[in-house]
Amino acid sequence: ALSVMSSFNDFDGIPVSGNKWLLTDILRNELGFKGFVVSDYNAINEMVKHRVAADGKEAAELALNAGLNMDMVDGDYYKYAEELVKEGRVSEKQIDRLCREVLIIKSKLGLLDDPFRYGGEGRWDKETCLPEYMEASRKVARSSMVLLKNQNDILPLKENARIALIGPAADSRSEMLGTWNAFVSSKNAVSF
């Protein structure tokens, strides 16, 4: 993996986004992870709600010192990183390391040469929605399903059986994508 996302939950009372033991000692030092860690949506600032940080500045300090490379959305790194370095609460060496780890991955992916490499008109369909990738997606979906209960042996359906899908999203391909789907076109939704 080139990137890992920290989760919202805590481990032993410390939110993962500010947990140095998990992000640095275990992930990097013990497991040898060489990529970068990104926070989940607003997870750094959520440490204030967890009551382990008094405010966004302290939350940013915890996350930076824990080894969390990238702040998704809440902006606490942007707002406070320079100030935290000036105050000596986060070392410049730590900031350099966190930035370097992100830039190494961006370089490996060719994003320093072409930052729009994986975006732009038609590139998504042409480069990522290839038939072999779509088939791999179907295979993953099929093999990851688990039937927890099969009351009255209703499954598998008999060949001549019919089912009804009812509700406002019953015939909506875009609903198969769910939330947080970025820029995926519903025509590329994988179903079987």
Q: Across the structure, where does each feature detected by a protein language model lie?
A:
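Glycoside hydrolase catalytic-domain context in secreted enzymes
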Residues: 1-192
